[in-house]
Amino acid sequence: MDSTTSSSRFSVSSPQSGPSAGIQKGRQRTITACLTCRRRKVKCDHAQPVCTPCQRGGRVCTYVTPQPVSQAPSRVGTGSRVSRTNLRSGQEEIRSRLERLEKLLERAISGGGNMSILPDAKGTSTGSPSDVDQGGNALPNPKCETLSADGYDGALLLEAEGGQSRWVSSLHYALLADEIHDVKMLLGDQSSGAPADSPPSDQPTPPFPFSGSTVESLTPWSPKSAEDCLALLEIFYSNVDPMTRLVHKPTLQRRFTQYINHTYGTRTQSPGVEEAADASRPDHTIHAFEPLALAIFYSAINSLSAEDVMMRFAAEKDALLAQFQRGVELGLGREDFLTTPSIEVLQAFVLLLTCQSREDDMSRTWTLLGLVVRMALSQGLHREPSLFPSSNMDVVQVETRRRLWHQICHLDFRSAEGRGQEPTIADEDYTTLLPRNINDEDLIEGAHPTAETYSPPGFTDMTGHLIRLHGIHCFRRIVRSTYRLERRIKSSVANGNGNLYPIAELQSLFVEVRTMVDEMVNHLQTQYLQYCDPQIPHQRMALGLAAVIEWRCWSIFWLRTPKQYREAVVSPEIRQTVLAKSVSLVESLNMMSDDKDAQKFQWHIGGHACFQSIMHIVSELETPEFQAANHRSLRSRALSVLKRTMDTRGHEVTPMWNVINRIISNCLAKNAPSTFPLSPFQAMFPPNAAIPGLGSSTTVPPQTIAQNSSVSGGSAMATPLPDLSEVGSLDMQDPTLAFDWVSESNALMRRSPLMFWVGVLEL
């Protein structure tokens, strides 16, 4: 007996007499869904004579009609006829689905890179009565959605408007769902076609972690006027966007105009956009943009001082920050951000976390970034967008997805270091390419992306950001390599395997890191640095940023190497250079508060604390190597910068700074002036001055990962070191170029300390 026959019995009473028959009739339940939808386990909209799912799939749609009790004997025969009819239609449907699946499998086997799963032609005509359910809610138009595969392990469900997307894993859905409607239901998207009388348990609830009352309008949390909105947008362009690069500015300008018109009832027109086209955008897309607009307002206020906020907007900075942050949180909750396919909602969340990321308190950011990573995976940002052939994705969306994913990777690495954890995202977890080295004005909305992934050399709006992303990529590889080696060593010791020699393994890793760093340096030099002019502020910022990345690589490797093996693996020359640059970095950060030109980037600089550099200085001052007389000048300079840090940051009350200040205090106590008298060097160069010859390349690395990895094993053996003469200088600049790092550093500081130091602090 098939499932249809058994289903039909629920609506057919048995021809029995007596009390049991009365009980049977009392429990009788009316079936309103068609038998085909019941058998396929999909939601039926009860449309007559053919429901929408059956119409789209070209299936036979049959309903069970309840009969009066007096006609019970004849109803059994009717039910049997219905069952036999549906048995035949079910077999036809099975054959049809099998044919579809066979075609999909053939496409996937023969090369699914160009596979695009579209709905059947049947039932896709627009404007038909079946496109609207009985409650008056419009069902999704299949022509606005495509399901495209990249030829690897899944597909991307793309909507025509708003850049909405969902990642569809091939493991469960991509080859087994024959309609986009089915895919959306399998993914849990029940927003379309849901009946109006759904039970209370199915109604949307405020999502965790931003639980609270849901709101329909975010106007109470918006700025007072459209003029304030435009002023905050300009502040965002000036102070925040150069450090984040999350948006495409022409697209953002157009969307902001729509937002202002929608919120304040104005008729402002975007430059270069026809008014009719601008007004035709549905309001629901503006709702998805509102959290991003409020996040931009938050970031703009966050980048200003309290005095500037009061002067420009006649309000307290803390009050406006609380207002806009609450608006962002309510907007995220309203848009169901945990499951949303909207990339604008995810941009809002990432921008908010970027502004709130502080090296001295990464606990909240670290936790919420776990949500961000899962949201990005759900939207398929971890897959290279240009590999998905779809008419619903233009070049702007391709670049936006790349930028957003790699900003998430950057925050993941930074927060992981701040929490002493291994980065969550690994290189093998994604295929998304780095953003192209191209200006926003050269990306045209609606232009179809090509297979061309070439990123032209030169200096653009993206160059500084790309230099940082290349550095983060190299940092992550070094950290993961050291973690893998650490696990191997610990496992070998635990298993009693004496065939693994830690020093030899670390020396081999040293050679690997050297090769990795050299490749990165050559790429940066070829693609970007040779086109930079140190006389131009933003290009000088890129040069400063690039110069410190190599130092960061060796600093990370040093701190991730167990203490007992460091001196046997890393050469004294590299150790001295890294220590000198660490001191320069902390000196630079201490001077930043006095630089008025750096105020607009102070929100970004203040989120860095140089914990890694401070810990590096403290650890090296305790070694015999830097207690020798030939290092007296560098040692005195290091002690001076630690004392200046105590004076500058002594008022900090965060738990992390309490620990760091205590460590610095203990270090200064051990190295009191009575034990180590000051040298004439300090009289010549104050503690906060740049030191000629040592360079002033600085960056602000995140907090150190646990540097004292406990590794059991024998003492350091005198094994031959790699040929350290082959290790290139940590000064990245090619001496044949016009810009020489050592000789020009002080001149750059005098010309523009803002762009010089902000560049290196951008890491």
UniProtKB/Swiss-Prot annotation:
Residues 1-20 have a biased composition (Low complexity). One of its GO terms (molecular function) is DNA-binding transcription factor activity, RNA polymerase II-specific. Keywords: DNA-binding, Metal-binding, Nucleus, Transcription, Transcription regulation, Virulence, Zinc. Disruption phenotype: Does not affect the production of hexadehydro-astechromein the laboratory conditions tested. Gene3D superfamilies: Zn(2)-C6 fungal-type DNA-binding domain (4.10.240.10). SMART domains: Fungal_trans, GAL4. PROSITE patterns: ZN2_CY6_FUNGAL_1 (PS00463), ZN2_CY6_FUNGAL_2 (PS50048). It holds the Pfam family Fungal_trans. It is found in: Nucleus. It comes from the Eukaryota. Induction: The expression of the hexadehydro-astechrome cluster is induced by glucose. Residues 80-89 have a biased composition (Polar residues). GO terms for biological process: DNA-templated transcription. Residues 34-61 bind DNA. GO terms for cellular component: nucleus. Residues 197-209 have a biased composition (Pro residues). Residues 1-25, 68-91, 112-145, 189-219 are annotated as: Disordered. Transcription factor; part of the gene cluster that mediates the biosynthesis of hexadehydro-astechrome (HAS), a tryptophan-derived iron(III)-complex that acts as a virulence factor in infected mice. Does not regulate the expression of the HAS biosynthetic genes (at least under the growth conditions tested). This is C6 finger domain transcription factor hasF.
